[in-house]
A protein has these predicted regions:
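Periplasmic alpha-helical coiled-coil/stalk elements that build and connect Gram-negative outer-membrane
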Residues: 2-4, 142-260, 378, 382, ...
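Bacterial N-terminal signal peptides
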Residues: 13-25
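Bacterial Sec-pathway N-terminal export signals of envelope proteins
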Residues: 18, 28-72, 228, 234-279, ...
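Short flexible linkers and secondary-structure junctions
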Residues: 29-153, 293, 297, 341-344, ...
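Acidic, low-complexity, intrinsically disordered peripheral segments
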Residues: 35, 223, 228, 430-457
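Sec/SRP-type N-terminal targeting helices
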Residues: 48-52, 65-66, 98, 112-140, ...
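Small/polar, glycine/serine/threonine/aspartate-rich low-complexity segments that form flexible
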Residues: 76-110, 239-249, 283, 296-335
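A short glycine-centered flexible hinge/capping loop motif at secondary-structure junctions
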Residues: 182-186, 407-411, 448
Length: 457
């Protein structure tokens, strides 16, 4: 038995060790975008709060069902002793004998009709639960989108730093060549000085890019609630997809995306749920003018004796309880006549609430329609910009390679070489920015078409 426990302990230690190695390896190679999303969802305080709200909604639905279809049952007991002149519980006459009574009772009641309030409450609780689930999904989507944007910022400035670093190395080599050409009399001191200034300017841009990368990383860590001891490392191996103009959706496909979003988007479903609940509340308020019908009943019994009364022998406890059983059943009908106009005021308020909810639902539909159309337009616009940025980068690379050869041969000045370097840097940076924007906008369109952000990766 002891050996078996020892083996189990060894297996557990091995399992924990392997898990730690796997986690360490994952952190070492950097977290992917999906890893960052999953981590942010796991640590999000906002999501934990919403999950608790959904659990409250489930409890409210259960309570509404039980309140509508089950009675309320109570049981109780009490005991008392009477002194002096009081009513004799055995003969129902007055005497000066001290008595002791112990009573028991069980009662229950159920509302048979209260203007369909119980039924409407069940429907309201069901809709509220649906709204809570949709709100939870909306929070998840917002966290994933914010994480994606922050992740793209880190990727952009990380790769921009790499691009600028490459230009710095190129300018260092150009400066070395310019000094050598100065020694050979092929270039003047002004060209060398200009190359040194260009190198210093590029090194300054590198520092700016690195600082922005550090700031973007802090923002991503804060968004993810990063709690690890080591600094967050992300996987920069992003998709280098090229854009093709034939990827544009047709008008029919755009209409399908819009229709799907209007029918399934959490924001619209939540607004519709609020409108439906407001309508049910209005119905309940109208039925408040109807009578209420309730049914109740109960069973009671008691035991009594005369302590200190000489020669009195009380009946056995069980026999007394059986003999003294009393039962009742009550059917109650209540008509509302005057309640200080509270029912009328409540009805007006519920009407106003329904008007507001209906207007908010219409607003949500218009906003979503505008967001979807803008998302499709942004995706197509950034796609066209990416297509042009890729062509521009290719041309600038050819020009850059040609200018490097000219600079080595002393055919262009340091100023022309600097301009070519800046043009290439801008082309690469704008192509990288266009690619990340296009990927982000494309993900938003996919989201509106029913694919959650985290499932896209």
């Amino acid at each position: 038995m002891r050996n078996k426990k020892s083996l189990n302990m060894i297996y557990r230690l091995i399992s924990v060790g392997l898990l730690s190695l796997c986690c360490t390896g994952a952190f070492a190679q950097g977290l992917s975008l999906k890893d960052c999303m999953e981590y942010a969802l796991e640590k999000s305080a906002k999501l934990r709060i919403q999950t608790a709200d959904v659990d409250d909604a489930r409890l409210a639905r259960r309570d509404a069902i039980l309140n509508a279809f089950t009675p309320e049952i109570n049981a109780g007991t009490y005991t008392y002793s009477k002194f002096g002149r009081n009513e004799d519980p055995e003969t129902n006459t007055f005497s000066n004998t001290t008595s002791f009574t112990n009573a028991y009772q069980v009662s229950g009641g159920i509302m048979l009709f209260n203007g369909f309030e119980a039924v409407n409450n069940i429907k309201i609780s069901k809709t509220s639960l649906m709204m809570g689930v949709e709100q939870e999904q909306k929070v998840k989507d917002e966290i994933c989108l914010a994480t994606m944007e922050a992740f793209c910022n880190v990727v952009y400035y990380s790769k921009l730093s790499e691009i600028v670093q490459s230009q710095v190395e190129t300018l260092k080599e150009a400066l070395r060549l310019a000094r050598k050409q100065e020694e050979l009399g092929q270039k003047g001191y002004a060209d060398v000085l200009q190359t040194e200034a260009d190198l210093a300017d590029m090194q300054y841009k590198l520092i700016l890019a690195q600082n922005k990368r550090a700031d973007a990383l802090i923002s991503l860590q804060d968004l993810m609630f990063w709690e690890e001891d080591e600094e967050l490392e992300i996987n920069l191996a992003t998709s280098e997809e090229r854009y093709h103009l034939d990827e544009l959706d047709s008008a029919e496909q755009c209409s399908q995306i819009l229709d799907f979003a209007l029918a399934h988007n959490p924001a619209v479903l939540i607004a519709k749920g609020k409108m439906d609940n407001a309508k049910l509340d209005l119905r309940t308020a109208k039925w408040k003018f109807a009578p209420n019908i309730s049914l109740s009943g109960g069973v009671s019994s008691n035991y009594f004796t005369y302590p200190g009364l000489e020669g009195y022998v009380p009946q056995a406890f069980g026999d007394q309880l059986a003999a003294n059983i009393g039962e009742y059943i009550q059917l109650s009908l209540s008509f509302p006549i005057y309640g200080k106009l509270q029912r009328h005021s409540n009805l007006r308020k519920k009407k106003n609430s329904y008007i507001r909810a209906e207007a908010e639902y219409d607003t949500a539909l218009r906003q979503l329609r505008s967001e979807v159309e803008r998302a499709i337009q942004d995706r197509d616009g950034t796609g066209s910009a990416l297509f042009q940025a890729e062509r521009r980068e290719e041309m600038q690379e050819e020009v850059w390679n040609l200018n490097i050869k000219k600079f080595e041969q002393g055919l262009i000045s340091a100023i022309d070489f600097r301009k070519a370097s800046e043009d290439l840097l801008n082309a690469k940076a704008e192509r990288l920015n266009a690619m990340l924007k296009w990927q982000l906008k494309r993900s938003v369109v996919k989201y509106y078409n029913g694919i959650s952000y985290i499932d896209q990766f």
